[in-house]
Structure formats: C-alpha cells, structure tokens
C-alpha cells in the first residue's frame, strides 16, 4: 500500500463479510489518484458499488466503485460543471464525481446513492472520517427514509426496469426480487438499509448464476407476489404525504454545509 494512503485515509468501521475486497479497494484508490492527479486534498472517499454490496457476486465479478472528490477553488468560484468521469481500473469501473453530485442525488432519495453511502466497503479521508461515519452509519436509514414517497418511486423505477428484463436475464430477475425485498421493508416500516444485503441473498445468487431461465417461476412471480406488491405500493402512494421536501432539503443541506465548510477551512 502506498504510504500516503494509510496516512490520510481510513476504512469505515462496519462489519465486512469478504476480506478480499478491501485490499483491492486500496489498490483502486491508489490507481485513481495516479490517473486523476487528485490527492488527499481532493479525494473525500471511495465506496463499493454493485453486487459485492448485496452478496450476489462470484469470483469473476468486477469491483465497481464510486470516488467522491471535493471541487477545486476555481470550480467553486467560477461555478463550473460538477466533475464526473468514469475510469477503468484493474478491477472494474470507478465513477469519479464531485461530492456535490452525491448530495443532489440524496435530495432525490436515489436508491443508488443510498447503496453507495451504506456500503461496508468504504475508505474515507481521515480529516472527514467522523462526519462521514455519522452520515453513513449512524444516520443513513434516517436519511434514506426522509422522503418515503421519492424513495419508493426510485425503487419502483428500478423494480420495473428489472421486471421488464426478467424473462431474458437471470441477473435482472434476481435483482428484481432483491428490489422487492427493499420495497417490502419500506411498506412494513422496517429498517430499509438492512435489506441492502437481502435476507435471501443465497437463493437470489443461485438464480442469478443459474444456467437456465425458469419461465414457470417467473410466471408465478408475475401473477402472484408481484401483483400483491403492486397493489400495496399503490395503496402506499395514496396514503403518503408528498410534501416532505422541506424536511429532506434541510437535512441534506445541513450535511453538505458541514462537509463543505470544513473543506473550505482546511484547504481553501
């Protein structure tokens, strides 16, 4: 490991089930720094994105990541477009983006950004570790469920995407069932983030990597549980207030202000 990495960055303190992931994450962080020229003054964190997060990977799965960076002084002064670039690493794809983009996604209650921030596989800049640990560990379920309407809409969109592909792809079908778990946890008012790793991940993984497509099972899903879920989701929308944006914006703006204020004090 590059010495500067260990000096300036730290793994998040969360339980991890796969000890092979984090050494590769450190390699990715070093590779991203070399390819972008960003160092500890610009890089906030690196987090895992994809199948390892929900235990549906195998030995051939890519390790895809997201790396959040701070804007430069000129980026802020001249209101430049938010930095965003996909970089191929030795293990997969890393999407490097301005941390302000992550907060924009949080304001929409995007399931994708929530997965990234809730990941147990994360490396954080030591200067911001306590603040990010609070956000990504202590308050992540609170943040995720601030606007249940938007959260469910986001999950609903993912669910329908995978549902439309399920007859042609075992991966899509397994992911559709994974999203069902998450939608059900919202409907039952349970801890949403616990289903980021599905309780039935073993059976979902078996479906994902099966050599054949079980059309009969898909028909049962389409006519059975999917129909019941759809009815309950529609009732959920009818009952739910949709005017909670002010509460969401206040909370997300607070976290963004805390982070950016500290960055400006330290670096600018």
Put a short name on every predicted segment.
Residues 30-80:
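Active-site nucleotide-donor binding segment shared across nucleotidyl transfer reactions
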Residues 124-261:
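Conserved nucleotidyltransferase catalytic core and NTase-mimicking acidic/glycine-rich helix/loop elements
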């Amino acid at each position: 490991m590059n010495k500067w990495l260990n000096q300036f960055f730290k793994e998040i303190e969360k339980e991890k089930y796969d000890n092979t992931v984090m050494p590769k994450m450190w390699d990715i962080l070093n590779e991203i720094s070399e390819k972008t020229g960003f160092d500890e003054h610009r890089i906030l964190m690196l987090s895992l994105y994809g199948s390892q997060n929900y235990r549906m990977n195998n030995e051939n799965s890519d390790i895809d990541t997201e790396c959040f960076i701070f804007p430069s002084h000129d980026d802020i002064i001249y209101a430049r477009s938010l930095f965003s670039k996909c970089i191929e690493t030795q293990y997969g794809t890393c999407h490097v983006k301005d941390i302000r983009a992550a907060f924009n996604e949080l304001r929409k209650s995007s399931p994708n950004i929530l997965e990234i921030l809730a990941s147990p596989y994360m490396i954080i800049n030591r200067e911001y570790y306590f603040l990010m640990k609070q956000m990504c560990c202590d308050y992540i379920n609170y943040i995720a469920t601030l606007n249940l309407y938007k959260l469910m809409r986001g999950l609903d969109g993912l669910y329908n995407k995978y549902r439309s592909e399920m007859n042609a792809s075992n991966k899509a079908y397994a992911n559709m069932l994974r999203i069902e778990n998450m939608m059900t946890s919202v409907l039952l008012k349970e801890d949403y983030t616990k289903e980021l790793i599905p309780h039935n991940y073993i059976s979902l993984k078996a479906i994902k990597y099966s050599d054949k497509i079980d059309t009969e099972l898909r028909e049962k899903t389409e006519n059975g549980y999917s129909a019941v879920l759809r009815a309950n989701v529609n009732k959920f929308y009818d009952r739910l207030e949709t005017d909670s944006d002010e509460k969401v914006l206040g909370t997300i703006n607070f976290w963004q202000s805390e982070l950016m204020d500290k960055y400006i004090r330290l670096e600018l």
